[in-house]
Amino acid sequence: MALGGEERKRRKGSERRQSSGDGVSCAASDYLVGQVADSLRGGPRPPGGGTGRLAALFSTAEPSAPPVFVPVPQETSKKRKLDDDDDDEEESVSQTKKPVLQEPSRKVKVKKLSDADKRLANRESALASADLEEELHQDQGQGRRRRSQSRGKVADGEALDVALSLAKDGGQRTKIPVNPEEERLKNERTVFVGNLPVTCNKKKLKSFFKEYGQVESVRFRSVMPAEGTLTKKLAAIKRKFHPDQKSINAYVVFKDESAAAKALQRNGAQIAEGFRIRVDLASETASRDKRSVFVGNLPYKIEDSALEEHFLDCGSIVAVRIVRNPLTGVGRGFGYVLFENTDAVHLALKLNNSELMGRKLRVMRSVNKEKLKQQNSNPSLKKDVIKPKQRLNFTSKEGKFHSKEGKFHSKNAFIGEKAVLMKKKKKGQKKKVQMKKPRKQQ
């Protein structure tokens, strides 16, 4: 390629030189002096001047042959080589950029499974699922064992929060087992305080009993929440009581038993205007039964002070308790009155059927529930009570009859007669009339 380009250049250069030499020689031989001036002046031209060589210069003669256009050759061979390299690179790039034709995908032939193959596949899947279930059960069992071990490591009597967190089940706290001996010792240090105003709080109650000893804790009871969504504990903390509630009760726990015994001196003291408190040991339950009476048929809206005034003439009263509904705080219609001695109980029993707020009271001795259970379980302790319904057997014609228990009654007792059943006639029933048959004539 490079050699052909050089030969073309040489030929073209020689042709140009020849054409330039011919033109110069022709111009020098044909030109005459004065031809240009005469043409400008417009004067008479010499004869034969029209056909001179000068006029031929301005004539438009048709070319003998059409011009030939020859492409210009490149100057250097290095540029040509570079261009060739570029062309090769472009061709390679174009070849790489051509989209690759996707080969047609081969159709996969699906084999039809036979019934035996299907059964085998089902068995394998069932076995695999059974293995997974066994692994899950094993993991759950290991988790339970770890939890039980961690619970076992917790020592008895450790923090209460840990015990409560372990006892949680489904968002509900289970009851923690209580040591009865510890509870008995705690009750000996506990004082019951009744008829407290709803405005009383823990700080006031502690300051009221601080002169007798150090107070360990205070718990409010008989609380009626103002809203149904509040619990009793939360209502006592937030001081949100029902507007109809006027008094509450509390338990005060001292650190020493001697302090609890000294605190009984506050019994009958006035903590607020119209509120005389009742103070008694929480452990004295056996002696209470002998010194207390049961009062029934009470008005539902009665207050402790009204019941206390009704029994003041019988003797000095230690405590009055009206049983109320734990949710609504309304009285259930019965209560208990505790006196200082048993002599006041005999006088209180005489107030049976007495009226209070338009109701006749029912006054009886307070009996321990455990004793009632023992009497019901032992038939020997029961009194002979005649049952209201007894079947009578009429055995003799003399008028004597006795019951199943074998007790005979007097002759004058009314025995009665056995009634004869009579069939009742239906209404509208007509008597049947017998038609006489006509005699046959002979």
From Swiss-Prot:
Residues annotated as carrying Phosphoserine in the record are 292
Among InterPro entries, the record links this protein to: Nucleotide-bd_a/b_plait_sf (IPR012677), RBD_domain_sf (IPR035979), RBM34_RRM2 (IPR034221), RRM_dom (IPR000504)
Question: Where does cross-link Glycyl lysine isopeptide (Lys-Gly) (interchain with G-Cter in SUMO2) occur?
Answer: 246
Superkingdom in the source lineage: Eukaryota
Bias-annotated ranges (Basic residues): 421-442
Residues recorded with modification N6-acetyllysine: 153
Q: What is its main location?
A: nucleus
Location of region: Disordered:
1-26, 60-157, 418-442
Q: Which Pfam families match?
A: RRM_1
Question: Sorted alphabetically, which keywords does the UniProt record give?
Answer: Acetylation, Isopeptide bond, Nucleus, Phosphoprotein, Repeat, RNA-binding, Ubl conjugation
Molecular functions (GO terms)? RNA binding
Q: Which GO terms describe its cellular component?
A: chromosome; nucleolus; nucleoplasm
Domain RRM: from-to ranges:
189-284, 291-368
Subcellular location as annotated: Nucleus, Nucleolus
Q: Which PROSITE patterns match?
A: RRM
Basic and acidic residues bias (residue ranges):
112-122
Q: Which family does it belong to?
A: Belongs to the RRM RBM34 family.
Instruction: State the protein's name.
Output: RNA-binding protein 34
Recorded source organism is Mus musculus (Mouse)
Gene symbol here is Rbm34
